[in-house]
């Protein structure tokens, strides 16, 4: 026996008529193995899995005289020792010193590797096995089949003729994502084993679509699979879809287990009336595990060639990303156009945090001309802000910021250069009182010399005494709101120093009643929760105070339970008013989930309004509009959400919103929405996604302005699920104003587990169609350039 070779156990089969291996039997998994989420695909090719071998007969090493006694039963071997080799067959001949020949369902096992064939020849001296006829090499979930193979077992070096193969690995998911088993299969002329987890294939195919005749696959002159680095390399390759080549690569690298990998991302192709034919071919650099970059050249048929790039980074203490776009010359406008964006967040010390958010474009029409997304094209202001925040404890914090905007449409807001804030809320005060405080210093500046500038200093200490008992609560609160203005550019001719001090008193109280009830043959816990909220703020003339950042709150349930009508610090409304409201809820007693909620409320005024913004009419009536809202899940598959604002003085509806959704299962959703605001808008919105049969799905949305008698937004799309691939198309038309309409076409082919081609409408559909489901989720992560 050669020195240094592992021990060998040879076991002739005790039963001549050994059963065949069952076809299609899945490999056994450890009971401790994590559950995996399989990717949708066509039926997988059946691969044989050998059953457990019969009891082994242990033979002593060559030269050992011990022999079993005549007629004695052969000894059964226990588990195979690490590094030991076991051979089983119906017939074994030869000697260990030269070579052993095993015939008839022959198997060789060592350290989790199985080599089986009709005939096996094994040389212990060279550790080389030659296999012929129905050859199978298996290790874990990996399988390779073919007619002939030569393999050095320990080194895992050799060749396999005309193999069919399937390799599977579990992904290493990000927190919150499921574990997925990512499999690839194909066939080749020759497979070269080049060490553990290293394979090189000639004239090979590769597909993550598991089927005997996959709809798509990679075809390569040379294919390398390196499962140590989890990287595949294609040379002279193409992607075949439905027997038609759609890609060709002289060389490409791709991840095997869905990890990030440098290389070209899938190209995006689209069409819009603003940009024309729109093609982008991004290149992705995986620079390190915690930072990467993308270079994205973009060709627009009507505009020209745009260069773009993005850089991202992430560490335990900070994270951020930067993005640039540059169009040297717009063929339509003849001008240079550009975009820049920087976002950064950092934990400087355990209590000190910093952030930076800078955004800029070359001109006001940049997004409207160069974006096909309504949410982007309708942007009004671009934020430019730097912020430091200090959290000293669980009851107080401070922050400092500088802030300005690039205004694309409308009036420029004031810049805050700087703004300092101090907030506190301490619960453990004497006699159960709660201390609150808000302090602010802000310097306002404006680019328009016709507008006033100056600083505002605010102190607002508050003291409250909550009484909370089962079934009710009462919380009185008193505070003094003090404001000091120092005006640098006072255009009114009044004093450049203004002081305002106002006491503010509120009383918040509520009751909570509960009872068991039955609705639609189901038991619920029903609540009745009346609430009364009183505010008293004396009048102070504030007409000489400029308006830097103040606007009236939108009227709604949040506003009627607030102490001030205005957002911002330039107006403190006089108030002697009470708000009364009642809420009733249906709660599932088993889960605690809220099934339905109904609320109605109204504010009552004891005095007329005297404080107002410039040009704002003052309220004279004693009753505010009535508010009502209802939301809930009517059935397990349908829900309603509605809100109503009613003017009792004129007996008119001021605003009304209504939305109903029917969603019986994934990728089935129908939505109806109606929005009304008197003299402002009246919109009807319909959207949905629904299977049409045969793997086809329809998705659409239409929004019509009943007030203007025109359609403001339309989406129409079709999707087809081919099992291991999906094709999507969508047309999007929207109008930011009646004279400016944008139209865009999205077409995408997604090969599950490989790549996508075209421009994806998925984000658009998720934003626009409530309940939209991506029909091929969950899928294996894209591997060609996915990140």
Swiss-Prot record:
One of its GO terms (cellular component) is cell outer membrane. InterPro entries: LipoPS_assembly_LptD, LptD, LptD_2, LptD_C. GO terms for biological process: Gram-negative-bacterium-type cell outer membrane assembly; lipopolysaccharide transport. Disulfide bonds: none annotated. Residues 59-78 have a biased composition (Low complexity). It comes from the Bacteria. Residues 1-78 are annotated as: Disordered. Component of the lipopolysaccharide transport and assembly complex. Interacts with LptE and LptA. Together with LptE, is involved in the assembly of lipopolysaccharide (LPS) at the surface of the outer membrane. Belongs to the LptD family. This is LPS-assembly protein LptD. The lineage of its organism: Bacteria, Pseudomonadati, Pseudomonadota, Betaproteobacteria, Rhodocyclales.
């Amino acid at each position: 026996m050669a020195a240094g070779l592992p021990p060998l156990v040879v076991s002739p089969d005790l039963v001549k008529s050994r059963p065949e291996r069952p076809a299609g039997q899945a490999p056994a998994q450890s009971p401790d193995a994590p559950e995996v989420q399989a990717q949708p695909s066509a039926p997988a090719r059946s691969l044989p899995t050998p059953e457990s071998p019969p009891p082994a007969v242990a033979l002593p090493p060559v030269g050992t005289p011990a022999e079993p006694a005549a007629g004695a039963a052969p000894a059964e071997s226990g588990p195979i020792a690490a590094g030991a080799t076991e051979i089983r067959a119906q017939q074994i001949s030869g000697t260990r010193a030269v070579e052993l020949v095993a015939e008839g369902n022959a198997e060789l096992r060592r350290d989790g590797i199985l080599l089986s064939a009709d005939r096996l020849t094994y040389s212990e001296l060279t550790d080389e096995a030659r296999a012929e006829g129905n050859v199978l090499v298996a290790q874990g979930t990996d399988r390779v089949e073919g007619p002939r193979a030569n393999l050095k077992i320990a080194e895992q070096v050799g060749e396999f003729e005309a193999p069919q193969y399937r390799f599977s690995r579990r992904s290493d998911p990000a927190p919150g994502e499921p574990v997925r088993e990512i499999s690839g299969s194909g066939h080749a002329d020759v497979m070269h084993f080049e060490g553990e987890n290293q394979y090189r294939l000639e004239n090979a195919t590769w597909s993550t679509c598991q089927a005997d005749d996959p709809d798509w696959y990679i075809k390569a002159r040379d294919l390398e699979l390196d499962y140590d680095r989890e990287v595949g390399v294609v040379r002279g390759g193409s992607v075949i879809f439905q027997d038609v080549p759609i890609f060709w690569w002289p060389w490409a690298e791709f991840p095997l287990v869905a990890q990030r990998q440098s290389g070209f991302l899938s190209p995006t192709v689209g069409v819009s009336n603003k940009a024309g034919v729109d093609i982008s071919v991004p290149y992705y650099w995986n620079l390190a595990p915690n930072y990467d970059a993308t270079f994205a050249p973009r060709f627009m048929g009507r505009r020209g060639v745009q260069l773009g790039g993005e850089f991202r980074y992430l560490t335990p203490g900070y994270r951020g990303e930067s993005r640039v776009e540059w169009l040297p010359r717009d063929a339509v406008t003849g001008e240079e156009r550009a975009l820049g964006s920087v976002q950064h967040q950092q934990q400087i010390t355990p209590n000190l945090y910093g952030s930076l958010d800078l955004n800029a474009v070359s001109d006001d029409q940049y997004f409207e001309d160069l974006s096909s997304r309504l949410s982007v094209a309708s942007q009004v202001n671009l934020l430019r802000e730097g912020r430091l925040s200090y959290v000293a404890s669980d009851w107080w914090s401070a922050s400092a910021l500088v802030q300005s905007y690039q205004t694309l449409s409308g009036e420029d807001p004031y810049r805050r250069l700087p703004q300092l804030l101090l907030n506190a809320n301490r619960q453990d005060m004497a006699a159960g009182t709660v201390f609150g405080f808000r302090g602010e210093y802000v310097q306002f500046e404006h680019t328009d010399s016709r507008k006033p500038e100056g600083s505002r200093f605010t102190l607002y200490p508050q003291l409250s005494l909550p009484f909370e008992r089962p079934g009710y609560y009462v919380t009185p609160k008193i505070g003094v709101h003090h404001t000091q203005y120092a005006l640098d550019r006072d255009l009114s001719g009044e004093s450049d120093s203004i002081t305002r001090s106002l006491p503010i008193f509120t009383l918040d109280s509520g009751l909570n009643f509960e009872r068991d009830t039955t609705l639609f043959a189901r038991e619920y816990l029903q609540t009745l929760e009346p609430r009364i909220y009183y505010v008293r703020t004396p009048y102070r003339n504030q007409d000489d105070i400029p308006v830097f950042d103040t606007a009236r709150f939108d009227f709604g349930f949040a506003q009627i339970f607030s102490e001030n009508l205005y957002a911002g610090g330039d107006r403190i409304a006089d108030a002697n008013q009470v708000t009364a409201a009642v809420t009733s809820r249906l709660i599932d007693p088993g889960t605690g989930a809220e099934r339905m909620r109904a609320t109605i409320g109204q504010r009552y005024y004891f005095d007329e309004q005297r404080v107002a913004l410039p040009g704002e009419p003052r309220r004279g009536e004693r009753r505010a509009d009535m508010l009502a809202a209802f939301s809930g899940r009517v059935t397990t598959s349908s829900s309603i959400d509605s809100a109503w604002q009613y003017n009792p003085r004129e007996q008119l509806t001021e605003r009304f919103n209504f939305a109903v959704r029917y969603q019986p299962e994934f990728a089935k959703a129908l939505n109806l929405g109606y929005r009304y605001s008197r003299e402002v808008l009246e919109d009807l919105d319909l959207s949905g996604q629904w299977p049409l049969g045969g793997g086809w799905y329809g998705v659409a949305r239409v929004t019509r302005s009943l007030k203007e008698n025109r359609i403001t937004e339309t989406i129409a799309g079709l999707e087809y699920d081919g099992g291991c691939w999906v094709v999507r198309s969508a047309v999007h038309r929207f109008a930011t104003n009646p004279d400016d309409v944008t139209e865009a076409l999205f077409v995408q082919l997604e090969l599950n587990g490989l790549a996508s081609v075209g421009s994806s409408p998925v984000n658009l559909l998720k934003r626009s169609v409530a309940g939209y489901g991506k029909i091929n989720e969950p899928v294996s992560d894209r591997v060609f350039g996915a990140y």
